Amino acid sequence: MSSVIAQKDENVVWHQHAVTKTQRADLKQQKPAVLWFTGLSGAGKSTVAGALENRLAEQGFHTYLLDGDNVRHGLCSDLGFSTQDRRENIRRIGELAKLMADAGLIVLTAFISPHRAERQLVRDLLPEGEFIEVFVNTSLEVCEQRDPKGLYKKARAGEIANFTGIDSEYEVPLNPEIDLPAGEKGIEALVDLLVEQLTLRGVISPR
């Protein structure tokens, strides 16, 4: 199903809240951020993001994980997998992540998001430094070996069209904030690296 973007109504204006984004973040003792995990299917995006959320929750930080499969059960259930619908899927998630960051949360998103232009679209929604692109750098070979959903096998057999990495291009991030060697290190080591980066960037502080 294709998405339809309504024209903006000039009578619709942004309502300023009495409680500010800074106040919400201060109450949580953290800095709002959107960690955008991108990579091939099977790269480990959801696994790493979930492990990071567990670690942050254990330390008392306020987070929310947006997963590619989960949002298609509700917010994006009307969208298919055409180029237009995939773009709209990312646009909606970007807007949702922006609202969650405005609430003072550390937002983790796990989406293939194969195109640089769409990732840039989300980056442009947020203040400088708030969008943290995390490239889950796992080779196609390793992803195919894992193939947890059997999708690569189906794509190779021609049962799935326009599958990213097989017959649809994945545009590797040119300058991600974090290049995560997910094909080389274990989950705990990757989470340690991410926590270190978040601390260096001032998103979190030791507790």
Curated annotation (Swiss-Prot):
Keywords (A to Z) from UniProt: ATP-binding, Kinase, Nucleotide-binding, Phosphoprotein, Transferase
TM regions (residue ranges): none
Gene3D superfamilies in UniProt: P-loop containing nucleotide triphosphate hydrolases
Any one GO molecular-function label of the UniProt entry: ATP binding
Catalytic activity: adenosine 5'-phosphosulfate + ATP = 3'-phosphoadenylyl sulfate + ADP + H(+)
Pathway(s) where this gene product acts: Sulfur metabolism; hydrogen sulfide biosynthesis; sulfite from sulfate: step 2/3
Disulfide bridge map: none
Similarity section: Belongs to the APS kinase family.
This protein's name: Adenylyl-sulfate kinase
Originating species: Vibrio vulnificus (strain YJ016)
